[in-house]
Amino acid sequence: MVQGSDVFAMSMLTIDWVTFLLKLVLVPTFIGVVSLAGRRWGTTVSGWLIGLPFTSGPVAFFLALEQGNFFAHKASEAIMVGIVSVFAFCLAYSRLATSLTWFPSTLAGMAAFLACTFLLDMMALPLLVGFALALLVLVVSALLMPHVGSDRISAWRSRWELPARMFSATALVILITGVAPLVGPQLTGLLSPFPVYATTLAVFVHRSQGGEEAVKLLRGVVVGSFTFIVFFLILSLTIVAWGVASSFLMAIGVSLLTHISSLQVLKFRNRFPGLG
């Protein structure tokens, strides 16, 4: 006779396998779509697409299924504030990218991300204060990004570049999500926005097209991340009262409308081929 604990263990194992398979499928698919969009419309559009919560959204969803709605509510608050660390990464990388190679730029970006995450982990910000902080840092980061020219469409150096991007991003997601549960729920939430896609694409774009193109990509990430902030604000406000399905549907719907609006900001600041 199967015990209740055995059923629970089997269900958790199933969820783990489903989550792992989703990582193997969704991450390379998204990287492929974003890379092809950048090839067609320019790197700014690639960065703008990265602003969608394609990594942290599923993390919050599975946390709700595994740990309950209140746990997901608290994690969503931390995830929303964690985007501040992503802005620190983008700004640090961009300030060096126009004069240095991808390696020191990446080191600076990672150092900024980790330092910011460490500071945020020592704070316990109320939801609306965290929301205001995220918006403020978004605006400041966008204003401090280096000014570069309009997007240009560049061919990839090798036919292996796209598969390499997809593999690198997938490996990074598996590594981060494997380590994160070991450091506690608060830090897990703060680490969930880890700039997997931004790091992968910025490095490849920097190597193949130059530092200015990497800056354009990361500017797109910063502006597009307004959607990220809105998504997790709505999720934090609704998931306990409304449940998983209704709260996620509301967050997704409002976020998509927000993301379309944010594209107009990018079109105003930086004209790119095929969209103007």
What does each of the following model-derived ranges do?
Residues F71-V81, F87-A132:
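Membrane-interface helix-loop-helix junctions at boundaries between adjacent transmembrane segments
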Residues H147-L187:
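Selected transmembrane alpha-helices and immediately adjacent juxtamembrane segments
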Residues I15-V27, L49-P53, Q67-S85, L127-V137, ...:
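Structural signature of hydrophobic alpha-helical transmembrane segments
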Residues T44-P53, L100-A111, L128-L135, S154-S168, ...:
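Cytoplasmic-side transmembrane-helix entry/capping segments in multi-pass membrane proteins
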